[in-house]
Amino acid sequence: MRLFSTTLLIAALTLVSCTTTHVGKPREAPGPVSLICIQENSRVVIDDILDVLDQGFLRNGIETRLFSVSEPEDCSYVLTYTARRSWIGVPFMRYAHLRLLYEGSVIATATYTGGLDTNPYASNRDKLDPVIDELVSGF
């Protein structure tokens, strides 16, 4: 019984501590995505997040444009995001959530959760590139 309890505890801790990525696509994009306007989130204090997002979309053949207040009229696709960081000696990104909208309706979401990642100090690019790739796959 004790061995079973210990095994169960280790399995539970492993599941909770893993890095997870979740992508949801409630709706298909009506056509190819060539431009995504990214709404700047001034509450996110992760310095390179906009560069990481821009480069991630460019790698997938999608141009980006940044806006802070008014959504540009010629942008059908808009990305909103939030991200959080933690500290263990130095800051690192532990969570990011991306929402892709088409004409105001959510068509896809993607979330990165670091948990008790074995490498929390990996670059933000290494953490978000697979999330971005999965978010736009099939568009």
Predicted regions, residues:
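A short, hydrophobic beta-strand-centered structural micro-motif
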Residues: 66-85
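Amphipathic beta-strand/beta-sheet edge segments enriched in Tyr/Trp
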Residues: 90-114
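C-terminal/domain-edge helix-coil "capping" segments
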Residues: 19-29, 56, 114-139
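Solvent-exposed loop/turn segments connecting transmembrane beta-strands
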Residues: 44-49, 89-90, 119-120
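A structural "domain/chain start" motif
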Residues: 2-10, 16-62
